[in-house]
Amino acid sequence: MIKNQIEYYEEASRCFNPLKHFQMRTQEMENKSNYGVRTASKWNEIVGQYLKDEIYPVVHPIGQETFSLYAVFPTGIFEYALDIDGATALIKKEGINPTIFNPTQIIASVDEGNINKDLNNIKTNHKNPVMILQSQRLMGNMPHCINGNHRIFEAHRNNEKSIEVYHFKDLEFVPFFYDDLSKAMYYLEMDFNNVINDKRDFLKDPYGAFADAF
């Protein structure tokens, strides 16, 4: 992703209308199947009770490290807000272990637009570890670095053999969402995919839905 794309996503995401997106998704689910009708009903209730007054885009707190992950939908570009400091706290609390990667395996996860290649202007900040998300729903299963872009880039450029990375897949990173709207959007898209494709991915109950987890 080049820099002007990042700037475009940031600007375009401000125009996104979450309530319109929820309405369109639930209508499509209702038209698909009885399961879709039940799932859409749950989401309409969630929107009415919890989400209709949510502020979007979310206000990122001063002094707290967060990350914006942008997703492109037919309704526009949505900003998922991730709490990097919170993710680090969870890693420590749960005793989660990193995975060892060769930098060549994960260099594609780095956003070129987030890399400052002028070594004199790089401000070192290693208070949080290198983290990568890999989500079928958010990124088509392509890994995406949410913290530590420069460390991966430098390790790759210096031909280092290994780097420690905290690697999170679908559902594992739900606690990282900074706001309820980001969490709801993620769960909504999981349900939408299952309804439209007549699947039950990541669900134990064939009659359940991710709306129940919200």
Give names to the regions the model predicted.
Residues 1-25, 31, 138-214:
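Basic- and aromatic-enriched surface patches that contact anionic nucleotides/nucleic acids
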Residues 2-144, 156:
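Short alpha-helix boundary/capping and kink motifs at helix termini
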